[in-house]
């Protein structure tokens, strides 16, 4: 029997390549890792040391989710067919590659959510960031993986847990695409990601379930996870902090990755407040900032004064 694209009928037309291959497989088509090692001994041995292997070696798993064949498809079909059918993650489209991973990782996100995500729409797949086989030869890696591997660590960044199976530390890996954000961490004030006290994923969700949204939560809710004292509730709330300005929240005033101004501010002058309070710039007391002069000292909110003045 032919597998893959050659075996697709009308009923199978909406299935991914991986789903088609497993849908047609019979129990006798699976041979176990030992059969794979006949040709791929080094790869099988390296994979046995990976966190992934500890899970897929569970004998309680169904055949189609066990060992090498759990990802690459039934082994006897690959060995016997004149046109060998196998799931090769470096030769599939990003959508097909992600669909193969999501057969087991559906709890991370659904295929529908993945297709709508920013990473998917940028042409990435799971193996763009995750290395399933330890020490995969460079010529078998995706172009993005080669780019990440070739890049020296941007900073002394915190190592991710080995169970994440990332190709590099988060700052280096994310920076291989988001270089402009990495450069912001070189500014005078920045969140302590380069120092290893934070990770990109402390704020960003690499597996988003809200379309193009890559932050863990709304801007305000995400920030107050750490900056609890700024969250209120206050008797008199400042509109940006209250989240009433189109969802920008804290970002109306702060630049989260890095800034050359104190306190991660977008500007350290009266012009910061003047973005919204234009009418106050010409007829107010002079001063470098509206708060350092000792007037509006509670910009996040106040329980005593609606103009956020000092008590």
What are these regions (language model features)?
Residues 2-311:
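Short sequence/structural segments immediately N-terminal
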């Amino acid at each position: 029997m032919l597998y893959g694209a050659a075996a697709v009928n009308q009923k199978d037309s909406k299935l991914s390549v991986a789903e088609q291959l497993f849908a047609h497989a019979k129990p006798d088509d699976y041979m176990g890792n030992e059969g794979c090692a006949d040709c791929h001994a080094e790869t099988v041995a390296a994979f046995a040391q990976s966190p992934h292997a500890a899970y897929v070696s569970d004998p309680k798993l169904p055949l189609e989710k066990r060992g090498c064949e759990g990802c690459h498809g039934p082994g006897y079909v690959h060995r016997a067919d004149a046109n060998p059918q196998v799931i090769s993650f470096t030769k599939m489209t990003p959508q097909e590659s992600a669909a193969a991973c999501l057969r087991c990782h559906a709890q991370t996100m659904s295929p529908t959510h993945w297709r709508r995500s920013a990473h998917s729409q940028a042409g990435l797949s799971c193996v763009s960031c995750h290395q399933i086989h330890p020490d995969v030869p460079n010529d078998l890696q995706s172009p993005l993986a080669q780019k990440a591997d070739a890049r020296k660590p941007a900073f002394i960044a915190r190592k991710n847990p080995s169970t994440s199976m990332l190709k590099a530390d988060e700052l280096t890996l994310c920076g291989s695409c988001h270089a402009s954000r990495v450069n912001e961490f070189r500014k005078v004030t920045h969140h302590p990601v380069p120092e290893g006290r934070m990770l990109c994923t402390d704020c960003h969700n690499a597996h988003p379930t809200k379309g193009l949204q890559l932050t863990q939560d709304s801007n305000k809710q995400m920030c107050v996870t750490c900056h609890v004292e700024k969250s209120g509730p206050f008797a008199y709330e400042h509109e940006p902090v209250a989240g009433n300005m189109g969802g920008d929240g804290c970002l109306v005033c702060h630049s989260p990755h890095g800034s050359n101004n104190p306190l991660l501010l977008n500007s350290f002058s009266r012009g910061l407040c003047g973005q919204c309070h234009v009418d106050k710039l010409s007829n107010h007391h002079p001063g470098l900032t509206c708060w350092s002069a000792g007037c509006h000292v509670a910009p996040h909110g106040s329980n005593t004064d609606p103009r956020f003045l000092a008590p």
